[in-house]
């Protein structure tokens, strides 16, 4: 004490806060200066002093001391504003769900972090002696993060799965939480409690395994004699702190020279003074000894270990450094799991650096070196692949910035930037060892409707036949509003017959039904227009012509409108290369004959028919059914597998020789009654029960047939089937197929059967096995309806004879098609018949004379003569009359004769220009249904449109050879004569007036805001246009019912066409907030359905942005229910840096799990190094040195990876502890060839050095390869079976050891503890060690020579090589087989 008092006068008073790190430094310096005993005396004084001061201070914590930071209000408000803006962008379809989540989390995380940083200065300025402030930085209780939750904001929490909840808790614990915030907080708090329990046990288990691996590693010798070392270069940009941490306490493996002068000798331990000399002198690469370089097998020497971390001298002999290493790595995990108040992982791939403009100016860079992209927040940016030089110039200053590769440029070229504006974002450096994981995020539909998208999609490879599509580029997915049929509460009663059929008002069947499954291949739709049957007219049905949609079955690629003429005759005339087919309507004949199926003529909208396309089809009433069922067709054969019962089974469309011969190919229809009910409706019958005819199934449905009831519950609906027929309980000897049903032909019976002949089958039957739950199975036997398709259909009865003659290059042939797939269930709706087979007329033409023609042009022609209207089909064998040309100046019709374009709108730049040549237009007149004789100008070519008014353009008529001049009349607005936007589109099937679904004029008046109800039919002149600019009539009667009462319609009633800002085409999707006119309303998002002169009707839709790589669940046009999965995003997310989350990472690295990236990287490196070194040095040497380098590389990567996890939490663990663990993981090799049958067996794990020494002793090469063991496997593969048995799998280990006759030499600690022997560690250990021969007495020359020989031996035959041999042995004597085995392994 006197000495301390005497020296105190000379010391400077040091007024500084001492935290844990500073205390460590102080204690280590005290030990260096005064020794251990004196230091402990001083620390006792410091402890006493601390307790005295704390008692005198008497800090107590009250609720008034929790002061909320003043700037919190506007910070939270600002974050809320950003979140609202983000939500708006998401609604507009500008950012997708993952970008929104990511940005939202970063906004709130940044706000929370800023508040946390503000907390300390705020306390320091307002209340420096605040107990909360003093205690939060004392390290005694609580930390900044917890105090921040008391006075800042609670922030973001994790859900039970560890994912972030993007709704932050804005309150702090002082203000109190709202109910929602409390619920969210409970998630995180509960997760914290559970994590603490689970992860604490994990950490304990990790420590146990670590200690188990290295418990036998003890310092047993002073020097192992190795001359190997790891080089550390000072020039490679290491920071001083990391260099000092790496070097201090190590031992040099070689002399260090500065020029010719030796500044440090081999085997000298490195202190702080020596490190400073190395740094100042910029010495050559320094070689140090590490546990990796030690020559020993199961122990370590003093010089390879270095200084002891406890007292700073070389480690003592007998010190159990293995156990210290295991506990050093395991202990931080155990301690740090108690940090329950973690904020969880944040969605950052490392915080990105921002480059800011130093002053105001204009920015310039080379646009060719960048390409546009999206940032991870969905903002537009440019990505540069190589170094980009950016120049910022103001009036008199030039500033150059070099942007590194893979960075985002956030401004445009030649843009004016302000000072401190962010101009670029540099990607955070992500090494191969950063912990990232791929996360799938499913986006669910929050509304129901029809799904559309605006790009091509690919099928995901594993779902080629499913409905999962992969997006190749960024697109919008649209959910078009409208419920699935009348299961919605609608005021107007509708009937839903088959898929996408006509909706008839006041129809006979107004039952509520669901739509049956859509079976569509190419996701396109074709239309046909039809006149209603006289039957409907007599019954008082609505008599207007309505459109009808039928799904195509994969043979067509266009949207077809077709015209159906009931009971009409076809008259065909031909002139040269044209077909003209006239339609005659025979009124008299219609009265006499019952209505029969007519021939439907199909012509695509654009009028182009390709080779082998279907021109017309005929539905034969013989193949028509009114009930649901299943069709089966294909070759019939006797099943050869079930010989016992001789059953006939359907064999698909395989080309097999049928044993059961038939004259014509039959197909079978198995009828069944099907009811599709809503999921919530009560069912009054049980599954697998038997009911009679007219049994009540639900409250308002009765069965039409009797039989077996089968109920299948699907998502949101119930499918109820009734099978008519017999039930048969088979005996034990009967074998019934477990798979699909079996068709049995008539006149077959069981062999050796004692049944009478009357029980033999007279008709085909369909046998199906049914297995109820917990009951014996039984068999349903149903009758089958057989249809035979005769070859000799009299074509003359269907089509006029002269139509079928092959003449004038055009051919028509008749083909039969099945409309339903084999074995596919057919869902029929009541009062609607199902067509099974369709007879089609296929169009073809001779290729010889018109070799280049791949498509013909078909059109309907109306000829009016003597007040009689005749319809003709004309087929022209000419090429498509459209030629396309791109022009960046504007959009307009460009006549080929070169007249000037006029009035081109400036906003139409870079649009597609479509030119019309002089003789390729056709003028036709269309008569309206009300025979008012209005005529329209129609161009007979698709995709022909013009924007803006235009003057005097000529269109030539092919038929009349005269040109029609259109002149602009100043009295008539141009848009009235030329369509809504001054376009001249093709108009197909135009009606002068059309109604919405309802006939109620008052309702229309209410919704369309018309002044006079009488003007309704005159006012509603609707156009309907697809994306090609073709206008046809609107089709409100699709499978989605657009009901005005469900607010699916939106009418912006404004004269917006005066100053149109954007081009509107019908069928176009418009995002919300897009301005379509200067003074017009901001419209909702949706699809333009109907365009009127001064208003348009939009079907509301919801956009979802999807980026490339996302998968869409569903077909184009499919109905999506609320809650269905819409799209799945896959994105990379940095795993949380929290230690409780970090522990599994450490464990994965130490266990060398295959799920982690490390083993993959290391395996690639093994191969890479081997190939490179083999290429340089030849086969044997290259392979050996390559293996040596690979193992060294794996050492470094494992150490760095584990260190990174702990350093991220501010935990410092010395490298040598981790090195000892990693050394044990990599110390085993796998014998790969039976080269030494007497010693090792193939596949055996042996120590590396043991294999080397055995090879040297026997002078024979051993073939083996390096393996990475996990800590658990390493624990179970030690030299001591007692140690292994006390770890885990005790019975197995002891049994194996007994069978092999293993001997335990009791070298480690654990086996001695188990058996109660003396532990071979500690200070008394020195007496037990027999000193090996000392190297110190060898003369210097011999020592140098032996060192040189050792170096050569280490280079050529390092102790971790794959072949062990000696220098004395001639290398070429080694058998070639060993090398062959090496290559194979």
Swiss-Prot record:
Reaction catalysis annotation: RNA(n) + a ribonucleoside 5'-triphosphate = RNA(n+1) + diphosphate
Subcellular location: Plastid, Chloroplast
Entry's Gene Ontology molecular function annotations: DNA binding; DNA-directed RNA polymerase activity; zinc ion binding
Cellular component GO terms held in the UniProt record: chloroplast; DNA-directed RNA polymerase complex; mitochondrion
Cofactor annotation remark: Binds 1 Zn(2+) ion per subunit.
CDD domains: RNAP_beta'_C (cd02655)
Co-factor(s): Zn(2+)
Keyword flag Metal-binding: yes
Subunit structure: In plastids the minimal PEP RNA polymerase catalytic core is composed of four subunits: alpha, beta, beta', and beta''. When a (nuclear-encoded) sigma factor is associated with the core the holoenzyme is formed, which can initiate transcription.
PANTHER family documented for this protein: DNA-DIRECTED RNA POLYMERASE SUBUNIT BETA
Record-given protein name: DNA-directed RNA polymerase subunit beta''
Organism annotation: Illicium oligandrum (Star anise)
Organism lineage: Eukaryota, Viridiplantae, Streptophyta, Embryophyta, Tracheophyta
The encoding gene: rpoC2
């Amino acid at each position: 004490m006197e000495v301390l008092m005497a020296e105190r006068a000379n010391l400077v008073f040091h007024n500084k806060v001492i935290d844990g790190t500073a205390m460590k430094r102080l204690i280590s310096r005290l030990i260096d200066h005064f020794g251990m005993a004196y230091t402990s005396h001083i620390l006792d004084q410091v402890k006493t002093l601390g307790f005295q001061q704390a008692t005198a201070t008497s800090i107590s914590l009250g609720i008034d001391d929790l002061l909320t930071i003043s700037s919190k209000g506007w910070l939270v408000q600002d974050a809320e504003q950003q979140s609202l803006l983000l939500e708006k962008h998401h609604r507009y379809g500008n950012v997708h769900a993952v970008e929104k989540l990511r940005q939202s989390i970063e906004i709130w995380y940044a706000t929370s972090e800023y508040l946390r940083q503000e907390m300390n200065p705020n306390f320091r300025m307002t209340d420096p002696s605040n107990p909360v402030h003093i205690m939060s930085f004392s390290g005694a209780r609580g930390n900044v993060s917890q105090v921040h939750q008391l006075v800042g904001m609670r922030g973001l929490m994790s859900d039970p799965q560890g994912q972030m909840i993007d709704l932050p808790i804005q309150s702090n614990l002082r203000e109190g939480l709202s109910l929602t915030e409390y619920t969210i907080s409970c998630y995180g708090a509960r997760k914290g409690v559970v994590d603490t329990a689970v992860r604490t046990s994990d950490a304990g288990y990790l420590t146990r395994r670590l200690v188990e691996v290295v418990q036998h590693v003890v310092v047993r010798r002073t020097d192992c004699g190795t001359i190997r070392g790891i080089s550390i270069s000072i020039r490679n940009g290491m920071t001083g702190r990391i260099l000092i941490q790496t070097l201090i306490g190590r031992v040099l493996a070689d002399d260090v020279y500065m020029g010719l002068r030796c500044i440090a000798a081999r085997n000298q331990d490195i202190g702080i003074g020596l490190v400073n000399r190395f740094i100042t002198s910029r010495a050559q690469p320094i070689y140090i000894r590490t546990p990796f370089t030690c020559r020993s097998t199961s122990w370590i020497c003093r010089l390879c270990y270095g200084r002891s971390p406890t007292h700073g001298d070389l480690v003592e002999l007998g010190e159990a450094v293995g156990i210290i290493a295991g506990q050093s790595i395991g202990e931080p995990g155990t301690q740090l799991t108690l940090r329950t108040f973690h904020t969880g992982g944040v969605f950052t791939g490392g915080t990105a650096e921002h480059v800011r403009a130093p002053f105001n100016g204009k920015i310039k860079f080379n646009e060719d070196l960048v390409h546009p992209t999206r940032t991870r927040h969905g903002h537009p940016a440019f990505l540069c692949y190589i170094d980009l030089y950016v120049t910022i110039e103001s009036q008199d200053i030039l500033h150059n910035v070099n942007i590194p590769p893979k960075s985002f440029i956030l401004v445009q070229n030649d843009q004016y930037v302000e000072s401190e504006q962010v101009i670029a974002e540099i990607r955070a450096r992500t090494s191969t060892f950063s912990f990232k994981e791929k996360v799938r995020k499913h986006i669910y539909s929050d509304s129901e409707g029809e799904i559309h998208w605006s790009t091509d999609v690919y099928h995901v490879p594993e779902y080629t036949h499913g409905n999962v599509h992969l997006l190749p580029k960024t697109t919008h997915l649209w959910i078009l509003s409208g419920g699935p049929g009348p299961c919605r509460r609608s005021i107007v009663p509708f009937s839903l017959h088959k898929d996408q059929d006509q909706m008839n008002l006041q129809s006979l069947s107004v039952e509520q039904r669901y739509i049956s499954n859509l079976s569509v291949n190419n996701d396109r739709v074709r239309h046909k227009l039809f006149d209603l049957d006289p039957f409907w007219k007599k019954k008082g049905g609505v008599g207007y012509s309505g459109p009808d949609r039928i799904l195509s079955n994969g043979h067509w690629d266009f949207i077809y409108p077709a015209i159906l003429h009931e009971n009409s005759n076809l008259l065909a005339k031909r002139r040269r290369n044209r077909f003209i087919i006239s339609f005659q309507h025979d009124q008299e004949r219609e009265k006499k004959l019952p209505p029969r199926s007519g021939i439907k003529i199909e012509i695509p909208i654009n009028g182009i028919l390709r080779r082998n396309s279907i021109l017309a089809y005929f539905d034969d009433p013989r193949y028509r059914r009114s009930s649901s069922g299943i069709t089966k067709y294909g070759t019939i054969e006797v099943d050869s597998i079930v010989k016992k019962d001789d059953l006939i089974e359907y064999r698909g469309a395989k080309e097999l020789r049928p044993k059961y011969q038939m004259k014509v190919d039959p197909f079978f229809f198995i009828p069944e009654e099907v009811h599709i009910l809503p999921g919530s409706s009560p069912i009054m019958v049980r599954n697998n029960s038997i009911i009679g005819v007219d049994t009540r199934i639900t409250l308002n449905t009765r069965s039409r047939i009797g039989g077996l009831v089968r109920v299948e519950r699907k998502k949101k609906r119930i499918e109820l089937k009734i099978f008519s027929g017999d039930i048969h309980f088979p005996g034990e000897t009967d074998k019934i197929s477990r798979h699909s049903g079996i068709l049995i032909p008539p006149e077959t019976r069981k062999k050796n059967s004692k049944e009478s002949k009357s029980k033999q089958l007279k008709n085909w039957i369909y046998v199906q096995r049914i297995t109820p739950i917990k009951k014996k199975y039984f068999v349903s036997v149903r009758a089958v309806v057989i249809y035979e398709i005769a070859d000799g259909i009299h074509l003359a009865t269907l089509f006029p004879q002269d139509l079928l003659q092959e003449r004038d290059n055009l051919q028509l042939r008749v083909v039969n098609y099945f409309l339903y797939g084999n074995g596919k269930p057919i869902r029929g709706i009541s009062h609607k018949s199902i067509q099974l087979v369709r007879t089609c007329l296929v169009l073809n033409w001779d290729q010889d004379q018109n070799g280049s023609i791949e498509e013909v042009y078909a059109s309907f022609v109306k000829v009016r003569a003597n007040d009689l209207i005749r319809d003709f089909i004309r087929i022209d064998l000419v090429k498509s009359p459209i030629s396309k040309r791109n022009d960046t100046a504007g959009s307009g019709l460009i006549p080929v004769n070169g007249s000037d374009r006029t009035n081109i709108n400036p906003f139409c730049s870079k649009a597609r220009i479509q030119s019309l040549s002089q003789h390729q237009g056709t003028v036709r007149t269309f008569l309206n249904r009300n025979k008012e004789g209005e005529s329209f100008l129609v161009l007979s070519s698709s995709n022909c449109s013009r924007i803006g008014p235009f003057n005097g353009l000529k269109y030539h008529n092919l038929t009349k050879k005269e040109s029609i001049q259109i002149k602009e009349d100043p009295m008539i607005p141009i848009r009235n004569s030329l369509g809504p936007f001054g376009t001249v589109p093709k108009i197909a099937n135009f009606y002068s007036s059309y109604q919405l679904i309802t006939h109620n004029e008052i309702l229309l008046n209410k919704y369309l805001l018309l002044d006079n109800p009488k003007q309704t039919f005159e006012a509603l002149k609707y156009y309907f246009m697809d994306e090609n600019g073709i206008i046809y009539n609107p089709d409100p009667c699709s499978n989605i019912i657009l009901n005005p009462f469900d607010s699916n319609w939106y009418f912006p009633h404004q004269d917006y066409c005066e100053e149109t800002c954007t081009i509107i085409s019908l069928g176009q999707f418009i995002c919300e907030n897009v301005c379509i006119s200067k003074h017009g309303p901001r419209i909702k998002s949706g699809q333009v359905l109907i365009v009127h002169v001064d208003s348009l009707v939009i079907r509301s839709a919801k956009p979802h942005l999807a980026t490339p790589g996302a998968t869409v669940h569903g077909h184009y046009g499919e109905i999506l229910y609320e809650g269905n999965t819409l799209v799945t995003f896959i994105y990379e997310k940095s795993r949380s840096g929290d230690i409780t989350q970090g522990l599994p990472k450490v464990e994965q690295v130490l266990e060398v799990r295959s799920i982690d990236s490390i083993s993959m990287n290391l395996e690639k490196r093994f191969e890479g190094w081997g190939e490179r070194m083999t290429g340089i040095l030849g086969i044997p040497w290259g392979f050996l040195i390559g293996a040596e380098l690979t193992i060294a590389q794996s050492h470094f990567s494992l150490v760095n990876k584990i260190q990174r996890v702990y350093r991220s939490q501010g935990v410092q663990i010395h490298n040598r502890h981790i090195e000892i663990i990693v050394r044990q993981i990599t110390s085993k090799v796998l014998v790969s060839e039976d080269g030494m049958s007497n010693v090792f067996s193939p596949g055996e794990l042996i120590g590396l050095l043991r294999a080397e020494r055995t090879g040297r002793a026997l002078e024979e090469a051993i073939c083996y390869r390096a393996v990475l063991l996990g800590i658990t496997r390493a624990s179970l593969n030690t030299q001591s079976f007692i140690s292994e048995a006390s770890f885990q799998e005790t019975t197995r280990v002891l049994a194996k050891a007994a069978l092999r006759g293993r001997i335990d030499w009791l070298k480690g600690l654990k086996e001695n503890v188990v058996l109660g022997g003396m532990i071979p560690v500690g200070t008394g250990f020195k007496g037990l060690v027999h000193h090996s021969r000392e190297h110190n007495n060898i003369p210097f020359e011999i020592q140098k020579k032996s060192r040189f020989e050792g170096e050569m031996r280490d280079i050529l035959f390092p102790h971790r090589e794959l072949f062990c041999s000696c220098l004395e042995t001639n290398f070429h004597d080694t058998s070639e087989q060993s090398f062959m085995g090496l290559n194979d392994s």
